[in-house]
C-alpha cells in the first residue's frame, strides 16, 4: 500500500507562507500593544481613563467600517494586493505617529490608530483565505491553525518586548 503524505505547505509556497504567517504575529502584537498605548497616553497627555478608551474604540471602528470594503477589494484585486494594501495602511498609520508626537494631539493619534485598524482588517481579510490557498485543500485548516498560532504568540510577546 502506497501512502502519499500531504505536505502542509507546497515547496513553491514556503516563502509566501512564512511571510504571511509573520503578518499574523505582527497584527497580534499590534492589537495587544493597544493596552500599553492606553496607559502611556493617560500619563503623557494627562487624559482620563474614559478618554483613553477611545484608543481601542477607534481602532476597532476601523475594523467595523473597513471589513466589507476590504472584502470587495480582495475579491476584485486578489489576496496579494489585499496584503499590500493592508500593509500600506498599517505602515501609513504607524508613520502618522511621528507628526502626532510633534503635535501632541491625542485626536491625531486616534486618527493614526483608525488607519492602523483599517490596515489590520484588510490584512486579516486577505491573509486568512490566502493561507488556505498555499497547498492542498485537505491541509488548509492545519495551515490556518498554524498561522493563527503566531497571532497569539504576537499578542503574548508584546509584554516581553515593551517592558522597560
Spans of features found by a protein language model:
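Cytosolic juxtamembrane N-terminal segment immediately preceding the first transmembrane helix
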Residues: 1-22
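Extracytoplasmic
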Residues: 16, 22-41
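Central cavity-lining transmembrane alpha-helices of secondary-active solute carriers
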Residues: 57-71
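C-terminal ends and interior cores of transmembrane alpha-helices
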Residues: 89-102
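Hydrophobic core of transmembrane alpha-helices in multi-pass small-molecule transporters
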Residues: 107-122
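Glycine-rich segments within core transmembrane alpha-helices of 12-TM secondary carriers
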Residues: 145-158
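Conserved small/polar residues in nucleotide/adenosyl-binding loops
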Residues: 159-164
